[in-house]
Amino acid sequence: MTDSLTLLRPDDWHIHLRDGTALETTVPHAAASFARAIIMPNLVPPVTNAEEALAYRARIEAQIPAETPFEPLMVLYLTNNTTPETIAAAKAAGVVACKLYPAGATTNSASGVTDIQHIYPALEEMERQGVLLLLHGEVTDSAIDIFDREAVFIERTLRKVVADFPKLKIVLEHITTQQAAEFVAQAPDNVAATITAHHLLYNRNHMLAGGIRPHYYCLPILKRQTHQQALVAAATSGSPKFFLGTDSAPHAKSRKEAACGCAGSYTAFAAIELYAEAFEDAGALDRLEGFASHFGPDFYGLPRNSDTITLRREPWSVPDTLTFGDESLVPVKAGETLNWRVQK
């Protein structure tokens, strides 16, 4: 049994940092272990153009701790009104990707796309410009069961987009089902997926059996154990199509522990440690570096990081709460023990 693991410094290819005073917590947490992060644009109002992306990046950069190299990679939020000109301007400003949220699919997605045909001209420009398409892969049809919405999205929307845009790099984010893992594995090389730590560690029993545990509630929702096992198999397979994206999504404790609680699990405080636990449980610690540090930059066409981090087996207790602006935040594994810790 190994007690130490050194990795090329990883990146987070999907994170929510929020805005305002929340950045005082989320940015240092992300920057502690990751060199780069793909920053989700679902603010209120959302980040829909180059000017807003640059302003948001500046607010993030203002919270990066001194002597800490961390690069926020900015993303535009696609709407029915996103134009090819908007895409071209974003590319020129350094934006690397655009995010498709089906309207109403998740937190702050009301401005999202109602019909993907509306954004085909924007997708064509993204394909030309080399801007990636990031997908929240769920339908929002109220007639579709919440546990089936990812699988239906693949059949109803994703297959056609992949066929229509063969040169567009597409990331199906935070996959949660066996169907998604199988689709991505069999798709052309321009299609990849991110997988969260919490979807590797948990299934819907953790959220629902013996009482409702709101801090496991996220979207796409945790699925049954067979899907969790398929995700673990994909993440630990060594396939370059699957890489790290935490989807760390903070909400104040009062907004989670409520009659109508918000969706999102907070993992950025110890993300790589949580992944290490999942990979160790699967007997695949030797596959963690590829998943966390190699395959994401390779897919994005960016260089791998050159520095390293070291994880040590050092059990520690996760705090019950963390500071979150003027409120508190309950992290994943609050009050429990994590067995790995990044050496400072």
From Swiss-Prot:
CDD domains: DHOase (cd01294). Zn(2+) 2 binds at K99, H136, H174. It comes from the Bacteria. Its EC number is 3.5.2.3. One of its GO terms (biological process) is 'de novo' UMP biosynthetic process. The keyword Zinc applies. Disulfide bonds: none annotated. Pathway: Pyrimidine metabolism; UMP biosynthesis via de novo pathway; (S)-dihydroorotate from bicarbonate: step 3/3. It catalyses: (S)-dihydroorotate + H2O = N-carbamoyl-L-aspartate + H(+). The keyword Metal-binding applies. Its cofactor is Zn(2+). Pfam families: Amidohydro_1 (PF01979). Substrate binds at H16, L17, R18, N42, H136, L219, H251, A263. The modification N6-carboxylysine is found at K99. Zn(2+) 1 binds at H14, H16, K99, D247. Binds 2 Zn(2+) ions per subunit. Catalyzes the reversible cyclization of carbamoyl aspartate to dihydroorotate. Homodimer. PANTHER family: DIHYDROOROTASE (PTHR43137:SF1). NCBIfam families: pyrC_dimer (TIGR00856). This is Dihydroorotase. It comes from Teredinibacter turnerae (strain ATCC 39867 / T7901). The gene is pyrC.
